[in-house]
Amino acid sequence: MARWRRGGTPAHGVWAGIGITVLAIGVIALSVQALQQTGAQATGSTATPKPTFSFGGPAPVPSDESVTGTPTPSRTPAAGDTGAPGVDERFLAVGEGVLWRGTAGACDADAPVIELSYDSGATWDDVTPTYRGIAQLRALATFGGPHAEAVADLGDECEPQAIRTFTAGEFWEPYPDQLAAWTYIDPTDAGMIVTPDGSIEAPCAEPWGLRARGGVVALICDGSAYVQDADEWAPLVQGGAAALSVNAAGAIAIAHTADTCAGVAISRYEDGTTDEIDCAEGADPQDSAALAFAGDALLLWSGDTVVTLG
C-alpha cells in the first residue's frame, strides 16, 4: 500500500519527478557539450596551415593532372633562333615556403597568368588579378617572406603599375609610390630600360628577360645575355640565352645552350667572371624558361617542370 505524504501526493511520485528532472538536465548538458565540440572542430578545419617545403633536393615533377589548367607556354622556333618569347616570357620567384611564377602576356593579346605553389612546384594555384584588368606582366618578385609584388600593365590604357599581395594572391593592391623603385622595359619604347636613376638604352631594340636587383641590371638581347657595366653593356653569354636571375649579392645566373650540356646549361657570373656550373639534362632549350636563386641553389622552370640545381 502506497505511503501518502501530507497534502495527498504519493512519496514514490515525488522521487519519480525528481528522477525525470535530473535526467532532463543531463541530456541538456550532454547536448551542449556535443555542440561545443562540433563547433571547435569546424573552426579548426578552417585554420589548417598550408604545407611548406625546403630546397634540399630536386623539386617533384608535376603529373599531367597537377598541371592541368596551369600555364605551360613554350615556343618551338628553328634551331639557333634568338627571338624574344613575347607573351610566353616566364617569371619565377622564391618566397618563404612558396614559389611564384608567371607568364608575361601582352596588351591586346594573350593575358598574363600568375600562380603560386606550396609544394615545390608540383601543383599551382592561379592567383592572377584579373579583376584589376591585368594585361601584361613585366616583373615579379617576393618580399617580406611569402608575399609577392609585381610590375604589370593594368586597365584599358595598359599603364604600368606596382602591385602587391599580402594574402597569398587573393587580393592585389596598387602601390603607386613603389613603381619608381623598379627596373623594367619601357612600355612605350622597348629599346629603353626604366630604372630608379632614369632611363638607359638597351643593347638592342627588343630586350627581354630583364632582371634587376641591388643596382645590378641584366637582360637578353638577340639571344645573348648582358649586364650593365657603368655606361656600357658587357656580354655574359654569347648566343642561346634563355633566362636570367640576380641574387642579393649581385651574382647573375644564366640559363643557355652549350655544347657541353645535352639540355640547358647554367652559368654564373660573379666578380667579373662567367663560369658554367651545372646542366639541366633533358630540359629542352627551345622551351620558354625562367630561373630563380633559392639560397645556394637555383630553380629552373622549363616546360612543365620546376627542377632544383646546385
Residue ranges of predicted features:
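Entry beta-strands of beta-propeller and related beta-repeat scaffolds
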Residues: 96-101, 144-151, 215-217, 250-253, ...
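Blade-level signature of beta-propeller repeat domains, shared across WD40, Kelch, NHL, RCC1
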Residues: 290-310
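Repeated scaffold domains used in trafficking and secretory/extracellular systems
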Residues: 84-94, 132-143, 176-188, 204-214, ...
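Conserved Ser/Thr-centered positions that define the repeating blades of beta-propeller domains
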Residues: 117-118, 163-166, 227-228, 265-269, ...
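Intrinsically disordered, low-complexity segments enriched in Gly and acidic/Ser/Thr residues
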Residues: 220-286
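Hydrophobic single-pass membrane-targeting/anchoring helices
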Residues: 4-45
